[in-house]
């Protein structure tokens, strides 16, 4: 038998192939217009698709349902029960915006609401995307769509860079200096700030670092020369760091997938291990809503 292992970046270029069986891991990554060409231009007798979470985009969901309707689902808590992954504990800790941050957040959030109303207030994301993709859209429609997306980015930036997250992060770290900790920030620059706040015990691992820098950070973390590895998205998937036993999440997104992936870094099975995950979030903000949604189907979640 011949087994070929290939990534989506290469698979979509294939044409005219016929496979007995195609297995797609992380299928949510293979559903874009470009990558789905593999399924259009090749044949297969059987198809198995796997993902930690179904895609949240309606179009991608429709594509996946046509390719491979869901026939089996297993939850993280069921995996813990079966001994597939280690037990976990998630603790959600609120932080407050400082005075000027709170003023800026309120101002931007009010503008966000204004632009959302201009878009009709119903599925504003889809409407804004439609407007910007339609050359016949009016100037007022384009202004509303651009304003909507701009305020989303501005609002998230205030949350991502909330100064009290660094203060709380340092406090948590110095109470857990014996742990091997993965830290996740919401933006690369803020991830660097988290890293610098406890230097020299941490190194950063994200897309702005060179391959040499990332390899060194990963190696020093594995050997124990540092006990904290700070990342943004680069460690969300594809890396197995079995000796990490604590995670501190300092940046939440609207996508539940990133939360599941980050938790996944900490629950890789290891005898006697309990994945300890601490999530810092800005209280009474959009971040709190995202976190509530991302953890709603998990059992062992503690809100402080």
Functional labels for PLM-detected ranges:
Residues 28-89:
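Post-DEXD/H (motif II) to motif III coupling segment of the RecA-like Helicase ATP-binding lobe
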